[in-house]
Amino acid sequence: MIQIGAIKLNDRLEIIDTFNQLIQPTHYVKLHPRIKRITGISQDQLCDAPQFCEAAQRFHAWCGTDCALLTWGCDDVSVFQQNLDFFAYSEPFPQMYDLQRLYGELTGDTKNRAGLKSAMEHFGIEPDADHPFHNALNDAYYTALVFQKCPQPQDVLRFSQTARKL
């Protein structure tokens, strides 16, 4: 895990804050060229970043006490939880919910896991050249835009997530 990205929305679903934290790897310290190409994150950027526990503490403080976390799919939750467990980080995070599952229900396709880009196209959301995919903050931004377009966004609360073993 090399980045945590999040967007904070208010009760009117307006973007009010962002969180972007790179994470210095402690085990696989050399960044694979494919990961660099996909994310746009360089080895030099990671060398100056805090390690996982400090990044998690910053994210936890940013989240505050009255929030829920939305993700697109279940993979990020499992990777995040795996890192929390590995580094013995014990502060509880807010409940996480899967917007991808709500989107599947909205479109009538609960068997396939639609990509974030497909959901954006469905809602007429254009990708921005300044926000390339596969960057945690940008993917969180696009997830927030899809959430804003959902007719009954509170329905996401039916899709709580628990981490699965990787």
Predicted regions and their residues:
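Conserved non-catalytic scaffold segment of RNase H-like nuclease domains
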Residues: 1-81, 93, 121-122, 128
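Acidic, Mg2+-coordinating catalytic module of metal-dependent nucleases/exonucleases
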Residues: 68-74, 79-84, 115-166
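Short, surface-exposed basic-aromatic patches at helix termini and helix-loop junctions that form
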Residues: 85-89
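Short hydrophobic/aromatic-enriched beta-strand-loop microsegments
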Residues: 90-97
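Short alpha-helix plus adjacent loop in nuclease-associated cores
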Residues: 97-113
